[in-house]
Amino acid sequence: MASVKRPDIYDFSKEAPRHRLERKVYPEVNVSGFSHNDEEVAFFTQVAALLRSGDVVLDFGAGRGEFMENDPSIYRRQMQNFRGRCARVHGCDLDPVVVENPTLDSAEVIEVGKPLPYEDETFDLIVSRYVFEHIADPKWAAGELLRVLKPGGWICAMTPNKWGYVALVSRLVPNRIHARVLSKVQPGRKEMDVFPTTYLLNRPSDVRRHFGHAAEVYHYSTSGVPSYHFGSMALFRLQQLIHRLSPPLFDLGLRFFIRKEDVRGQ
């Protein structure tokens, strides 16, 4: 199928084998740059509904902003980049590379167990992309995120489901070889973007336990476009079938929307 060459929609120079497969399977990618069941577009559409122009936003675990470098979909990049859409975007990460993130107005390197470098009730919105699965101290993370969030503010997090097949297999693979394995399973994935996993905040019950005392916790589960398939069309199709047949308990991803209680009743 011929593709519409629209550099303002889809950047072919950033297309990895997994993106190429997606474009073959889902014709609409050739129209808009993303598929009808794109999990990231769905999540960031929810976030966009919450975002206001005067908001101060924290990107928790912001990393280097790899989506700006690796994602061929212009729309998906725009949805994930909050800079210019709100008052200010702060970012923090354990990795010093966060200071190079082009989507942030300011960046801070943090340490587990130490207070985040922000005053109480600073942020209207906190976004976390695939970070919860790496958190080694959930009590610390939840406490600090709730501390720096304004009353009535939202924490929006996307993370794997602990009982999805990707997380189940991942827990069988030693962290020391995760990067090597993922580069084979998910062609185009760079080693610098792979980190040790803990899966301590990857069930709804885990998130409610750590955040629920001071916040309302909403979530949904999802299994969208396959991405762990070695670049094989056969495996891609097999994973599509698994996604359709699996009950929600075994969906690949979880999306959390956590609203801090507002004692003022607003």
Give the label of every model feature segment.
Residues 114, 119-120, 137, 203:
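Acidic/polar helix N-cap motif
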Residues 125-136:
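A short SAM/SAH-binding and catalytic strip from SAM-dependent methyltransferases
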Residues 72, 120, 138-142:
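Conserved strand-to-helix beginnings and helix N-cap segments that scaffold or border functional pockets
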Residues 62, 131, 160:
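Short glycine-/small-residue-rich Rossmann-like dinucleotide-binding loops
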Residues 18-25, 30, 136-144, 150, ...:
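S-adenosyl-L-methionine-dependent methyltransferase catalytic module, highlighting the catalytic core
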Residues 114, 133, 164:
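Active-site micro-motifs of SAM-dependent methyltransferase domains
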Residues 1-119, 125-127, 249-254, 261-266:
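Conserved N-terminal segment of class I S-adenosyl-L-methionine
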